[in-house]
């Protein structure tokens, strides 16, 4: 199996407090992995570093073989993300987490964020908006039918993967708490 996420020697300090200390982990394609620990152990901070919300004090994060977050020994941090040309990189001082999301990695939050008046299926479809490629003209004249069909098929596949396909037509708020978290 190939590595989809690699966290290498990541440390995150806030003043004198070390919230994450030399974190190393590797997640292979197809694996579902949980980060478990007591309150205050640094789980949320680790996710915030991995997804680009925080800049690490030390270490690097790789996603799908590309380095997306890196701290240089001199203390000058730079984040990297794919540029327009395949294989090229654009170096910026502080890209927002949406750049990392565009690469295909997103995170969930401790508080559930659902569109309460929407179905389970529609919640996932709405969340996939950053994966659509329709321009204004195509959307205005409903020329995006094929892409819409592809998005709907992908949503069905995702719901099947997490065991929510059977409740796809239910309102998101009608689900038990555990299933809402999965959604």
Tell where the protein language model's regions lie, with residue ranges.
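Conserved ABC nucleotide-binding domain
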Residues: 89-94, 158-177
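Conserved ABC ATPase "signature" region
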Residues: 135-167
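Conserved ABC transporter NBD signature motif
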Residues: 59-71, 77-89, 103
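Q-loop/switch helix immediately C-terminal to the Walker
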Residues: 111, 117-139
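The feature captures the beta-strand-to-loop junction immediately N-terminal to the Walker
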Residues: 36-38
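Conserved structural motif at the start of ABC-family nucleotide-binding domains
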Residues: 5-7, 20
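Helix-to-loop junction immediately C-terminal to a conserved catalytic motif
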Residues: 51
């Amino acid at each position: 199996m190939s590595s989809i996420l690699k966290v290498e020697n990541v440390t995150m300090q806030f003043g004198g407090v070390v919230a994450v200390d030399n974190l190393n982990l590797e997640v292979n394609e197809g694996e579902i992995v949980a980060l478990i620990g007591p309150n205050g152990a640094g789980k949320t901070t680790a996710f915030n570093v991995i997804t680009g919300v925080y800049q690490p004090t030390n270490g690097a994060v790789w996603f799908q073989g590309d380095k997306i977050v890196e701290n240089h020994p001199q203390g000058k941090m730079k984040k990297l993300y794919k540029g327009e040309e395949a294989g090229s990189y654009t170096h910026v001082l502080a890209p927002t987490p949406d750049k990392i999301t565009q690469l295909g990695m997103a995170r969930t939050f401790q508080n559930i964020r659902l569109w309460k008046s929407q179905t389970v299926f529609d919640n996932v479809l709405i969340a996939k908006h950053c994966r659509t490629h329709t321009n204004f003209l195509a959307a205005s004249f409903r020329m995006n039918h094929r892409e819409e069909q592809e998005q709907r098929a992908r949503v069905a596949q995702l719901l099947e993967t997490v065991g929510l396909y059977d409740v796809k037509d239910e309102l998101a708020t009608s689900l038990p708490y555990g299933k809402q978290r999965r959604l």
